[in-house]
Structures are given as C-alpha cells and as structure tokens.
Amino acid sequence: MRTIEKIIRRLGYHNSEKLFYLSDIDKCVDLSWHDRRVLRELAPYAAYIVDGSVLTVFFDDLNDRPDVDLHGKIWNAQMPIVISDEGNYVKIYNGKSMDLGIEKKIRLRDIISYDLSQCDEENEFSYWNVTNSLSLDLYERSMCKKNLNEFLIDNLRYITKKLKDEFKISFANKLMLRVLFIRYLIDRGVNIGYMGLGDNVKQSQEIFLSIIQNKNDFWALVKYLKERFNGNLFEIDEEKEDAEITDASLVVLHDFLTAKEEMRTGQLCLFPFYDFNIIPIELISNIYEILLGKEKQNRDKAFYTPEYLVDYIVNRTVGNYLIKENECKVLDPSCGSGIFLVKSLQKILEHNAESNGFLKDKEKINKLVEENIYGVDYNEEAVDVTIFSLYVTLFDYQDPKSLEDFRLPLLKNKNILYGDFFDEENMKAIEKIDYKFILGNPPWGSVNQHNYKKYCDDRNVIAQDGEISVAFLLKVQEIGDVDTECSLILPSKILYKGKSPSVALRKRLLTNTQLEQVLELSAVRKQIFKGAIAPAAVLSFQCQKSALNHKVEYISLKPNKYLKLFGVIMIEPDDVKYVKQTLFLENDDLWKILVYGGYWDFELLSIMRNKFKSIRDVVIEHKLILKKGLQDSDGSKDASHLTGRKILDSDKAIDHFYFNDNAYSMLNKLTIRRTVIPEIYQAPYVLFKKGLDCTDYTIRAVYTEKDFLYRETINCIKGSEADKKILLNLCGLLNSSLFSYFNLMLGSSAGIEREQIFLKELEDYPYAYSDELVELVQTMQQSETIEEKEELQKNLNQCVLRMYGLQDNSFVDYVLSTQIPLLCGTYQEKKCDVKMMKEYASIFSKIWDEHFGQSGVYYTIAIYPDIKGKFAAIRIKLSFDDSVDNIYVVDNINEDVSLLADFMVYQLNDCFYQAKNVVEFSEDSFVIVKSIEAKNWHPAMAIKDSYKVLNAVLLGKGDC
C-alpha cells in the first residue's frame, strides 16, 4: 500500500463517499466541469469534495514534478487544504495562502508537519476535524492577510487606475479586459494562429509580452481577434484609441504584466503567476465588479456580490430547474459585471455539454446564450465586463483545439442592454420575454436618477428614504409572470423599518407574491460584504401569485468560521424556520423576531405584551416625557434660551449606571438646527445613549438629578421628584440583560445595522416594577469597584428576569448566552460535556413523560457525549420494562463501526455546509445526532428537539 493511501486511511477519509481518487473525478457530479478539468491538470492522488467544493487534496509527488509549477497551480485553484506525503514526514499546506520565494516562485504556506504515526482520526486535519470549527485554529493562523482574489483585485485596480489617471486612457477598463481575454486564450492553450501565438503556452506568453510593447502590433492583434472570433470586446474606436494609447503607457503595461512595475502601494504584483486556465472566469467577472470603482458605487449605489452568495442563489433556482429541463431564460436587471448571468450560463452549458464537458456544436452554444441570458446595467463599463465574462464562459465549454469556425455572438444592446431599467421605452425589447428567473443584486440607497422615482410615484408607492431597490422589487414583479421566480439581494432594513411606507411595502409583497425563501444575512454582513456593512437579505418569490397559507422557508445565517476561512455559506439547523406567509401579514414584528429567534420567542413576546403594561402606558400614566436631545449643528431654530448652558459630551458623559458631570462643554450658539421642549433638560431623569453597547446589546442608562443640555444621541425619560422610584426602576430595566433580549427581538436596528434604540420601539417594550430593582439601581450607582459592579449587575439581571417570570426560560437564556455573544464576537466555542447532555436528556424525558407517562411504555436514554470528537448523540430506546436505568452514559464508541453507521455520522460529516441534525427512527428506538458544540445541546435545543420528535411520532412520520 502506498504511503499516501496509509495517510488517507489513518486520517479517516477512506470511509467517506466524498473521497474521490483521480481516476474517479468525473464521477463527482457535484463538481463543475471547470473544477474537474483543474483537478485533472493538477493530478492529485485523491480529493475530498464536499457540496461541490474541493476541500482537501492529497499528493505524494507535490515537489517531484520539475516541469510543473504545482504550488502555483494549487494556489491559483485556491484549494484550502493540501496533504502531502514527503517521504520521512507528512506536510500540511494552506492552498489559499502563499509566500513568494527568493527564486520568485509561488510556494504554498506550510501549516505543520507530522510523522506518519501522528496521522490518526484525532489529528487536526483528519476527516472529522477539517469540518470541525473547534479544530481549525492551526489552519486559521496560517491564512495570509490576502488571498488570490484580493491580490488580483489590488493588481488590476492599480494598473487600471494608473492608465486612467496618469496616461488619460478613458477606455482603460476595456483595454485590460482585452489583455485578460488574450491571456486567457493563451493560458487555455488556444492556437490563436497569429504572430506566433500558438498552443505552446509558455512560448505564447513571451510572444504576447513582446506584442504588448508595440502599439501597431497590439492593434493588429486586436483586429485579428475581431475578424476571427467576432464579438463586441474587440470593437475599436481607432481614432480615439490611437490618440490615447502611447508608447510610454504600453511600457508600463508590459512592466506590470512581467511584475517589473513596482506598485506604489507596496503590494506584490503577481500577474506573471496567475493562471487563467485555472482561475474561474467568474472570479474575473466579480473582481471587475469591484474595479468599476468607488465612483460607480457612490453614484449608482452598486456593490459587488460575493461569488459564494451568487452560487447559492443560482444553485437553488437555475440549478434545481435544470435537473429536469435543458435551458431557461434568466434576466439580471442590474447585471454589474455579470456574475449572476455567468453562473446561470455555466449551468445551462454544463447541462447541454457532452460527456467531456465541451459543446462541439458552435451554433448551439451561441444559441444557448442568445436565447437565455439577458441583462441591463446603467453603467456602460459594467455592460462591457458582462459581455467579456460571457464570452470567456463560451470558450470555457469548448475544446481549445477545435475553435476554427467559432464566432462570438454580438450581445451588446441585444441581450445585454446599456441603459436605465426604468426607461420604459428602451426596455420594451426585454420586457416581452417570458423569464423563468429574475436574479440579481440591484443598487441600494437613494440615487440621483429620475426614472425610478417616477416609476414609484406612478404606482402610488413611497420608496422610504428614496430607496431605489424598492423600485426594482416592484418592477420585476411586473415583468415576471406566474411562472417567474425572482431572487434579489436587497437591503434587509426594508423588512424591519417601522414607518408606514415600509410596512405598506411588506404588505404589498406578501399580498401579491408567493414568498418562497428569505435568506437573512444581517448577522454575517461584515463577513460577506467587505467594505459595505449594510445588512442584506435575499428575497425569493413567485411573481403574480399570492398564497397566504404557503410556508415560507426563512433562513437566518449566523457567524461561523467556514464563511471566513473557506468562503462558503453554512446553514445550521437552527438557522432554518418554516412560517406560513399569512403570519407575516398578521404580525409585522415577526420579520425581526425570526432573525435571531423563532416561534418560541414569538409566543413568549406575545404573552409578555398581553401580561404586562408597556413603557408607553407607564409614560402616559405618570406623565413622563420620553424624548431625544437637540441638534446643535448650524440651523435657524432659536436657541438663545439655551445659550451659555452646559451640554454633555455624548461619548464620555454616560455609561451603565455612570454619570460624568465633568464631561461637558458650553453651548455658544444662538440658533441651531433643532431644539426640543426645555422641560427635558430639567432633572430628575434617566439619560440613555441612542447607540447600544455593542458588547452585549444592552442600553447604557443612568439616573441623575443634575440639569444639563444633551444632544440627539442621548435620550431621556424625564419625570418629577415624585417619580423617582419609577425612573430608577426604568434605569434598571434599560441596563438589564432582558432588555438586550428585547432589543434584539424587537428593535429594528439591533443586530441589523448601527445598533441603535429608537424611542417609538422602546415604548412598546413590556414594563414591570420591583422595589428590589430600585434598591439595586441605587446601590449600583454608588458602587465604585469593578468586582462589586459585576456582582450587582448579575443580581440585577436575575432580578429583572424574576420580575417577568423568565428566570428559568431557556429561550431567553439561549439568546443571552449564545446568540448575542456570537453576534458580538465574544462567543467562546466549546464542546458539550456530560453534565450538559444529562440536562438535555432530562428535559427530553420530562416532555416525553408529559405526553406518554400513562401509556405503560418505558424508555431509556443513552448519552454518547463524544463521537470522533465531532458529534454527540442520545438514543432513546422504548421498552415495557420499568426496571431499567432511565438515563446512562456510553463513553467510547469510536471503534463501533455498526453503531457509527446507525448514527449516520459519515453522511452527517459530509454535509457540513448545510449542517443537519439526524433524527433516525428504528422499530423500538430513535437517535438524535448533532455536532458536539455546546450551543447545539443547550436546554432550548432540548425543548425544540423534543417537540420535533413528538410531532414525528404523533403524525406517524419516519423522520423529522
């Protein structure tokens, strides 16, 4: 047996159905043709492939192919983990990170080396641990600050900007697209057949570098490519381009392509090391979406879409549809660089390809794009990039050795329109087409364009804050018919804003469409949208079809390491809920509750509101004033009655139970932008910051009897001396952990964007009173040591929970102990232990007894606290014997092959991107298997799981 095979077996990969040896790569139907082609070129001994992505590759000759730059090729392929047999030891490399050696060659970054004896199933890179977030620290530490994508972005941004700014080349983007296209043809081994550019890749790369230094030679090559392949990319405005291109600019371009040009940013220029035969073209497309630049983003409010998010959307729409069909018409109404269209075209071409992944029929391949792919963009450079990306995609599905008769289709202003989506005259051509899918990431925010505003006005729709995405959301419904599914990335704020235009928009959506899925991304916004932390959601719906009893799949992603390290969307079981559409219509709060909670939280909050007064009720009853402070920026409002008074420093004056009366300045203006009734500056009052404490989402509030002015970033609840206890009680509530739960469940901003509290929302929170809380607040405000404050805060939190009868509520505890720390980045991952699992089992037992205690059927619960360091399980075995132990622990089953098979741990481990809990039934027992992370075995999960199993048993289902 070869040593590499021993390594695979010792690490546990050999039992997985997702391990593919090189000769079997084509049997992996989840893998794209591009990735299969890349794997065949890299020729690893084997690859571990999960959900269509290569996660781990195994080599026993990584450094033994002198004629092949394997390190460079693997880095271009961005394969995360490389396990290499290197004779006396086993070395692990990070395939997404590299160092540039002295000899100017790419070398993958070393992670660690092992003796063969150290390769076992407990190893950090074993089959069980490469998908275990508790075991990824070594890999995480080996990551470069930048991956290939980011290097390529920096490189292309640098040269494009230099050509535009220093050499005044207005078509610099298009020039670089041509360069990239030619490099792609060369790297693919296409015999261009001009000036020595043949199928010898290295030789052709050198010839192209020579051509690029001579303007006449370069133009001659572009004209030749236009004549040979047709297409919009090679159309030349000779007079303009000849005037703008200079010999000096071509020298700079040549030096950039050879890495001789030193980038002023100090970043590495890696262009000679890129292999465009391996780099997916959708990456180039996506990069150019970024390169269109801040100017486009600021003007058109268009932000780039991460590739893995596009994959998710296209797979669940176009991909699923093509399981039974051959093609489908797709529109992206704001196509940007065309990544949605490229991914959709790839699906169509793959479905129509022959067994080798290519399409021989040149007419058919053009027909597939001309009859199925449509896009619009307001930016002409974006249209050019889209067409470039589609052209390269067409080449990607053809044998580079048989392109003699191939002519690219002309797509500009036929399929891919340059113009305003809301210019009804110009859009008539594409509006008559029967689309199966409308996909995209439309611009967000208020844009200086007229047509979309008129479009909304004509339909009596108010786009709150001038939000252009609202207009896109409406128009795609008009273009689509009952068979059209739309899937759009939208600012999630439109789902939570409480003002009437947003409420009306949600009702309109729920009434006029069948909502298929909501993918909520707010919790992972900083991981997904780099440089733009606006919260997003993907809304997928059927046009012109209302179905209020239809169940909506609601998914709210949570932060996880896989998104950061592997660039994949991981959906955990608790992220998914199924909700009747009518419930959203009847309960507008449900949109926000579901982001971090579920049905149990919805029920709990409904009970709280019915059982307790609201803060609004207390404000009215005691004639309190609830207001925010003044705006002291320049304005015309008379402030002479406030001039010369102390105004608090919003940042330094207030914290939890803390008031710094020395943190102030003097108001010296006679007029300001906005004043407020002067009574609110007269103590006593509770002052609290508008911005939440981002470490735990609590409100920073303090009671004081000192008079001050304060700005709008500080709110107040003002009363009289007779209201002191009420104010102290309110101060305690605002600072409590329970109110951070309310903030996350009911506040439109908390956990979404900017983390603020709005007074209109706060007024609706449930209110309770306790003299114990009042005393705690008084003590808290006088305490001085950190230790004393921490102990008092714990007591205060428990006191408030008791006031609401929630001291033992598992769902509130889950949000406070897990959801909020996850969101705030303070959560410490850990494994569950026997004590935790016994508590889980006892809750399960209690609920089971409530339903079946008198049935004469008894049961035992076996606890398996650690299976392969990755999973834990409980098995409930039914019996008519009441003498057996009710709950017991089984310590080690790692070598019990039949039990591992019964528990389906291999199948579970191979589906980690869409993690599932296994609930498997047999004749007299059932088993629950989940990841070993403590959060999955929390008491709240025990309650949820118990009722899932009960439903399955009572409804006669074999699974749940």
PLM region descriptions:
Residues 1-112:
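Nucleic acid-processing catalytic cores of prokaryotic defense/repair systems
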Residues 2, 99-101, 120, 308, ...:
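Signature of N6-adenine DNA methyltransferases within the class I
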Residues 73-148, 558-575:
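Mixed-charge intrinsically disordered linker/loop segments at interdomain junctions
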Residues 86, 113-345, 349, 372, ...:
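Preference for the N-terminal adenyl/adenosyl cofactor-binding alpha/beta module
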Residues 138-172, 176-192, 203, 308, ...:
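C-terminal substrate-recognition regions of SAM-dependent nucleic acid methyltransferases
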Residues 520, 693-710, 728, 732, ...:
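Short, ligand-facing micro-motifs at secondary-structure edges
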Residues 590-632, 652, 769-960:
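Non-catalytic DNA-recognition/assembly elements of restriction-modification systems
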Residues 683, 712-764, 772-775, 933-960:
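Basic, amphipathic alpha-helical recognition segments used for DNA target recognition
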